[in-house]
């Protein structure tokens, strides 16, 4: 996945030090109940679409942009499903990051599911009982988005 320019500029000053970033995740649910997933080009795993906010960008706008870029599907955010701080992560090149992730439940409003081949190798709609293998973090986001009620957050 391409690294945003603002992060490349920051890395020139901070090297591999931990960066605190805001990310957004979309759990896109069709009328049929199927969930939109993409197989990531960077690690080959299935995941929900999403990405990093650009400086000054609103979370919902970043979400709409990222889903369209990665999957070709236009979405309308319906509600925030969860707000969580993920554990720190170190990339293969040594860069360290930690994300506050805002997960939105969305509905599709246009476009056509297709991989962009830069960030997504495959894109598809999956019944909730037929999801491909995914990590626990992604499964948790999907579960929160499918629940009714207030957004999930880690209680103090």
Regions flagged by a language model, labelled:
Residues 21-23, 32, 120:
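A structure-centric signal for secondary-structure junctions around beta-strands
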Residues 1-25:
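Acidic, metal-coordinating catalytic segment for phosphate/diphosphate chemistry
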Residues 28-31, 106-108:
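Active-site beta-strand termini and strand-to-loop segments that position acidic
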